[in-house]
């Protein structure tokens, strides 16, 4: 994938779908916060920053934040 098409896909103001990152592996997973068990029911992509280079490296890094929707599991 070329740099320009990657940037277009990762552009947060783009009207096309932004979800280049497959987070489906987190679906129905369980997370523990402060010893309380939660089941992840949905993950929403919130913000995406376009990929950039770090120093002299050619690696492109896209930064995103996601909202994790979860429900507490009674223990």
Swiss-Prot record:
Superkingdom of this protein's organism = Viruses
Q: What is this protein called?
A: Uncharacterized 8.4 kDa protein
Q: Cite the source lineage.
A: Viruses, Varidnaviria, Bamfordvirae, Nucleocytoviricota, Pokkesviricetes
